[in-house]
């Protein structure tokens, strides 16, 4: 184990800056997460990237936003700008449940304290900095700002909100994975350009008047419905989102413009996907992989989850309707080299408390490493949000060979007893039949090796629902494929004399889902002998198709009306079907089935199950409508559904690693 000094972390105090011999810093980052010097934490990635580019950087983690703002003043004025890194998860998903109850724990804070970050830290921190240092630029990054770069629906305010630049007063957003644009911005500002003149950096968002738009509004620009029009017309908001999502998933995107408050929000197209060399350089930076020494003796839950995990790639071409990964990372897969991955695993092996077990060797999805289009020219003109829905694209190379090579190289290292695949396996990719029989053979090999060598006892997969109509709106494969995969999983377990479980994830109250769909879900999962655990109520989060459908009532691609359960009563009526096997739920479920005209399902659910004694006080032990079934926050019982905004955030903390 390498011995680290205080100066091995980026400085967080004036004293630490002086220890480095600096008299000022170029960039000061304010983070709403605890400072963990690890490639899964966005502030660390941006700080290390700027350091490698020759700039001096300091981090102020979780500043106190009350009182005299001393945490915002303690490092003084930066030479270039303040950066806001609001955290790996959307702050409102982090703080509140789907039922808008305060969560009992903040996974990104020391000892899980839930009072270390404000609501919307992007806005709170920026307003304080602009009050204290009005002439210093403030640049936003991270999942919270990235997904609020244009007009968006805010579930917690239950209203349509403007581009977050309007509410915060910041000067610029760097959206998505920000290593390349942040360095380019520093170069521009270091050369003396005012930030108001920096308009040509890809992957940035800024506000300006129409006459100030570089090159004016051209034929290649996409002019969205104005914020004011979206307030008046929900169909306009739905129509906007189709363009926003398409441009987020194109290799050569167009510039987006949206009028708001007598100005335009200008969204420059993103950089091309990072090359392997570029991604390696980011992951090879000199991270300590440890929390800052200031947290000695304190537990940071998110770090505990990922400290023995390694990320293989960025991007996801699944295109799930409730997920923000493609909006933040894009659908094109950027892979690390085998060398870079193995070197990081060696660093994990050297950690003093490592016992030989890697908790996760994956990415946004577990088995997309090395996959790409066979014909790059076809990908260059494609604007499909998903490469595998409604069918696997014939141009997609689904070869798992490169991923197997990574597994074999890692498992061969001295000190590795076993590497687990924590979650996110796309079984539709494993079951897809290619025209190339060699690829099919590798898929079968991968499936067997996954089940026999990389499961910790429970393999988590995400069918999400059983209704094909709901799954179509979710952009997920038919539930029949889950049944096929479960048969394969069970067969291999029998052949190898293993006693492992497959754990399915499900969502209730997704747009298009009604009580009857949930009732049939209960029947089908009962027939498969599941007592569901990993379940959650749909939470609308910014910049997903599902959220736009939920808010507007229209499918953004067809503009056809779509039903959504919105009231607490409607949501509870759906959610209770997950727990049909609990005696305290039975009476309410039977009543609901009779109400919707599906009394025939009562027999299918409860045949042979003695009816409980419906005494006077029966059902008093039912949980409140939005409380978790384990007695903590609410019924969102999925463990670390992060990265996908708790799968609707696809920023979370297990195998989902959003950064600037």
Annotate each language-model stretch with its function.
Residues 19, 27-31, 73, 201-204, ...:
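Flexible, glycine-rich loop/tail regions that form catalytic "lids" or insertion modules at the edges
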Residues 25-31, 38-79:
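Nucleic acid-processing catalytic cores of prokaryotic defense/repair systems
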Residues 30-35, 296-324, 357:
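N-terminal pre-triad scaffold of radical SAM enzymes
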Residues 42, 61-260, 267-273:
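Glycine-rich beta-alpha loop elements in corrinoid/cobalamin-binding modules
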Residues 90-99, 147-149, 179-184, 209-213, ...:
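Flexible glycine/acidic-rich beta-alpha junction loops that bind and position SAM and/or redox cofactors
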């Amino acid at each position: 184990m390498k011995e680290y000094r205080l100066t091995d972390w980026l400085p967080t105090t004036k004293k630490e800056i002086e220890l480095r011999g600096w008299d000022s810093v170029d960039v000061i980052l304010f983070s709403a997460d605890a400072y963990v010097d690890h490639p899964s934490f966005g502030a660390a990635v941006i700080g290390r990237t700027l350091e490698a580019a020759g700039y001096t950087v300091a981090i102020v983690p979780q500043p106190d936003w009350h009182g005299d703002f001393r945490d915002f003043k303690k490092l003084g004025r930066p030479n270039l700008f303040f950066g806001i890194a609001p955290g790996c998860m959307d702050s409102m998903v982090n703080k509140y449940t789907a039922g808008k109850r305060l969560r009992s724990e903040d996974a990104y804070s020391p000892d899980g304290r839930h009072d270390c970050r404000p609501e919307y830290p992007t806005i709170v921190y920026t307003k304080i900095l602009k009050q204290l240092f009005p002439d210093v630029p403030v640049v936003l990054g991270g999942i919270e700002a990235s997904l609020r770069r244009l007009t968006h629906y805010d579930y917690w305010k239950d209203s349509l909100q403007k581009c977050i630049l309007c509410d915060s007063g910041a000067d610029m957003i760097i959206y998505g994975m920000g290593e390349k644009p942040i360095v380019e911005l520093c170069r521009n500002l270091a050369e003396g350009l005012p930030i108001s003149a920096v308009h040509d950096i890809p992957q940035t968002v800024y506000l300006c008047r129409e006459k100030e738009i570089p090159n004016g509004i051209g034929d290649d620009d996409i002019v969205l419905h104005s914020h004011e029009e979206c307030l008046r017309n929900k169909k306009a908001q739905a129509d906007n989102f189709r363009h926003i999502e398409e441009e987020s998933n194109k290799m050569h995107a167009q510039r987006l413009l949206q009028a708001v408050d007598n100005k335009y929000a200008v969204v420059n197209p993103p950089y091309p996907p990072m090359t392997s060399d570029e991604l390696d350089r980011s992951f090879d930076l000199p991270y300590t992989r440890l929390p800052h020494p200031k947290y000695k003796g304190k537990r940071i839950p998110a770090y505990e989850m990922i400290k023995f995990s390694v990320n293989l790639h960025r991007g996801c071409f699944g295109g799930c309707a409730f997920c923000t990964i493609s909006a933040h990372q894009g659908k094109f897969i950027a892979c690390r080299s085998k060398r870079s991955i193995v070197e990081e695993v060696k660093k994990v092996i050297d950690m003093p408390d490592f016992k030989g077990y890697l908790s996760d060797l994956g990415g946004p999805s577990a088995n997309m490493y090395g996959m790409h289009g066979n014909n790059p020219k076809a990908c260059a003109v494609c604007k499909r949000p998903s490469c595998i829905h409604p069918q696997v694209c014939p141009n997609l190379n689904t070869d798992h060979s490169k991923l197997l090579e990574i597994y074999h190289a890692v498992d061969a290292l001295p000190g590795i007893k076993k590497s687990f695949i924590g979650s996110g396996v796309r079984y539709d990719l494993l079951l897809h039949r290619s025209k190339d029989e060699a690829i099919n053979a590798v898929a079968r090999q991968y499936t067997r090796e996954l089940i026999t060598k990389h499961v910790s006892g429970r393999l988590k997969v995400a069918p999400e629902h059983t209704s094909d109509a709901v799954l179509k709106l979710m952009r997920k494969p038919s539930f029949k494929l889950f049944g096929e995969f479960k048969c394969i999983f069970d067969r291999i377990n029998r052949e190898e004399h293993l006693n492992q479980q497959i754990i399915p994830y499900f969502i209730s109250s997704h747009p298009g889902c009604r009580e009857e769909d949930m009732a049939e879900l209960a029947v089908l999962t009962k027939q498969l002998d599941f007592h569901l655990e990993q379940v959650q109520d749909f939470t609308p989060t910014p910049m997903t198709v599902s959220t736009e459908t939920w808010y507007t009532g229209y499918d953004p691609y067809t503009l056809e009306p779509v039903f959504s359960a919105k009231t607490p009563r409607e949501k509870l009526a759906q959610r209770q079907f997950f727990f049909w096997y609990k005696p305290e739920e039975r009476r309410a479920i039977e009543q609901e089935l009779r109400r919707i005209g599906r009394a025939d399902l009562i027999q299918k659910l409860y045949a042979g199950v003695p009816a409980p004694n419906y005494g006077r006080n029966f059902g008093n032990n039912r949980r409140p409508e939005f409380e978790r079934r384990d007695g903590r926050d609410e019924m969102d019982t999925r463990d670390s559904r992060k990265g996908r905004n708790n799968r609707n955030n696809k920023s979370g903390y297990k195998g989902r690693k959003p950064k600037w």
